[in-house]
Structure formats: C-alpha cells, structure tokens
C-alpha cells in the first residue's frame, strides 16, 4: 500500500506540474513575464532563481512542502494590471490561451499515454471502449467470474444444495458470461421449461445440478460478478485509439459530473419535501453522490494501491484518466479554477467594464471557499472509504 501511495503522489505531482507548465509556456509565448514556477504549496522547501531559462529571465523555480498542487506566478496577475509584461495587460485572446493552456496540456498528456498503451496494452474497462476495427484486438488476461453471493432460505437453490461462494460455470449448457445472462437464462427456464441445469465449481470440483422450476418461479440466489480483465492492442491505429479514447473518456467525465451535480441538487431539494418517500429517495441520491466522488486521499489511499497490484499498464491508464479529470475540472465555471476565471473575464468584457483588483479578489475568494468546502467533504468521504 505504501508503494502505491508513493507512486500515486509522484503521478499526481507530475500531472499538476504539466498543467502548470502549460500556463507558464503560454504566458511566455504571449509576452507575459513568468516570475515563479512552483510544485506544491508554501512553505518553501527549496528554490532557485534562474537568470535565463526557457520560461524567461529571473524565474524562480520552487518546490514547496505541501504536495498535491502547484502554481505559476505571473507578473501583474490581476486583470486590472496594465504594465508591460503584466498578465492584465495581455489581450483577451492571449489571456484565454494562457488560462486554457494547462487544460490543453492535460489532454495532450492523456492522449500520449493512451497512445503508448494502445501499442503495449491498453486496459479495456468498458464494453464499447474506442477501437479501430481491423487493427485493434482484445486479449483476455483473466476471465470474468459470476458466483453465488447469497442463497434465499427454502428456495430452489437451497433445496438443491447450491451454496454461497459457488462459481457459476454453465446454465442450461450455455457458458456463463455475466450475471445478467444468468438471470435471463433462469427466466427462460421458468417460462418455457420445468427444469434448469446448472454447472457450478466448488473447491475446484465441478458439479452439475438439475433442479425443477415452475413457471414464474425464482431460483433464489443473489449473484456477485467480477469483470474479465482485458487488454486492447493496436498497431498502426494506436495514435487514433489514443486520441479517440481520450475524447471518449472526456465525454464520459463531463456526463458523470453533470449526473453527480444533478443528483446533488435534487437530493438536497428533495430532503425538504413533505413526502417521506421523496425524502428517502433523496437520501439514496446523496449516498450515490458520496460513493461517486473521490479526492486525493481516496486516489492515493485506495485507487493507486489497487492499480499498482495490476501492473504498470493500469498505473499509466489511471494517470491518463486523472489527467483527463484535471482538464475537465479546470474547464468548469468555478471562479477559483481556470474555467471560472475565463468566464468572469468574459462577462466583464461583454459588459464593457473593467474587472478591478478588489472585485477579482472577492470573486476568487468565494470560489476558493466553495472549493475548500467541497474538498473537506470529499476528504471526509475518502476517509470513510478507507475503513
């Protein structure tokens, strides 16, 4: 677990470094002076001011004590600044490029990682994962498994000595591929036949059970399912697969964020409904939200240790997904993030008004408070998952 946490910390640091480097390079290319490039948040651990570097003159490069973050400090960062070399003095389009350069770098990093993985083995985690017919091929590293999670008392399953932990091999001579397929075969047997044939594996031994089942009857089992571990391999189409997979998971991430926000808002509103049924439904929605979100503690303490056990390819795949998540998060219109800063800047431009330093500080402070509150809640939920 410790190794997984260390790997996760390194990956997160590198992804944030890449994001901030995007901002810094874009600033330099658009005539904005970069004063500081830092990994982590203060207090300062080590640092050095370099007279001449690829980010400009007299840039201070720092590593700070608080990890999981980073920043670029530019000259005249407030929109109202107007001296030569100030961020505020740059044109609207120059600021737009600077603000979204970090997002672009995160997407580029994800696409590059996924392209390399498409050559050496890209973990396939969804059935419709992007691939190119005629080139991409799927290899099953570890077959899936459907097993009996529980047996209902006095049910057909119990009467025929089907036990919790039994692995389902075949139902009616058809190979078991998923829990959904088993449910369908059981229903077909109860509707069209008077018996069901089940082949199970118990303690390494295969056993066949033939049980009578009447029309509409249930077998009386709950199933647990472990998905097959599959890898996708491509040759000439690897760059296409890398970009396509990046776009696919970007879309899924946006959809996921929308669903979470929708459930959060409706869940909170429904909590005040007079109907007990609606309030219970609200509790379920909020519980789903709590299970769907993961912060740094969850990523480092749960996800990376599990991914580490599955090898380098899964770690790289997870790094790509986190890079996509960083890009999506920074596009969102939250004032303290890149997308929020751009939205505020755009609103003031459309209104033809100057965004004063005081107004910008107040808006950013509100955004930061919202972010810190969300992070506090997510961190608490992460710790509950570690138990």
Predicted regions and their residues:
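Conserved PDZ fold ligand-binding element
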Residues: 149, 157-180, 246
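Functional transmembrane alpha-helices
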Residues: 90, 141, 214-326, 346-362
């Amino acid at each position: 677990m410790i190794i997984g946490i260390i790997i996760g910390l390194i990956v997160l640091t590198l992804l944030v470094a890449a994001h901030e480097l995007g901002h810094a390079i874009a600033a330099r290319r658009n005539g904005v002076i970069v004063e500081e490039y830092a990994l982590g948040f203060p207090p300062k651990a080590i640092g050095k001011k370099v007279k001449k570097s690829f980010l400009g003159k007299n840039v201070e490069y720092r590593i700070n004590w608080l990890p999981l973050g980073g920043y670029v400090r530019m000259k005249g960062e407030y929109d109202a600044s107007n001296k030569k070399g100030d961020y505020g003095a740059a044109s609207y389009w120059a600021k737009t490029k600077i603000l979204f350069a970090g997002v672009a770098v995160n997407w580029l990093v994800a696409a590059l990682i996924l392209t390399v993985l498409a050559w050496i083995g890209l973990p396939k985690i969804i059935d419709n994962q992007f691939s190119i017919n005629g080139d991409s091929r799927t290899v099953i590293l570890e077959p899936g498994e459907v097993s009996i999670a529980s047996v209902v008392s006095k049910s057909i399953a119990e009467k025929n000595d089907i036990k919790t932990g039994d692995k389902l091999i075949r139902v009616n001579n058809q190979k078991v591929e998923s829990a959904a397929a088993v449910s369908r075969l059981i229903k077909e047997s109860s509707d069209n036949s008077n018996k069901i044939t089940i082949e199970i594996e118990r303690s390494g031994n295969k056993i066949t059970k033939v049980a009578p089942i009447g029309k509409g009857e249930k077998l009386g089992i709950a199933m647990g399912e472990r998905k097959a571990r599959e890898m996708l391999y491509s040759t000439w189409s690897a760059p296409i697969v890398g970009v396509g997979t990046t776009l696919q998971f970007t879309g899924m991430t946006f959809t996921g964020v929308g669903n979470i926000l929708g459930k959060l808002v409706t869940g909170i509103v429904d909590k005040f409904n007079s109907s007990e049924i609606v309030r219970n439904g609200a509790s379920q929605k909020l519980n789903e939200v709590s299970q769907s979100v993961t912060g740094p503690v969850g990523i480092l303490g749960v996800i990376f240790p599990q991914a580490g056990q599955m090898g380098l390819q899964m770690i790289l795949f997870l790094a790509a997904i986190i890079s996509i998540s960083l890009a999506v998060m920074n596009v969102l219109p939250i004032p303290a993030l890149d997308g929020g800063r751009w939205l505020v800047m755009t609103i003031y431009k459309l209104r033809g008004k100057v965004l004063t330093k005081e107004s910008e500080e107040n808006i950013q402070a509100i955004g930061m408070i919202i972010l810190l509150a969300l992070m506090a809640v997510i961190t608490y939920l992460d710790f509950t998952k570690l138990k």
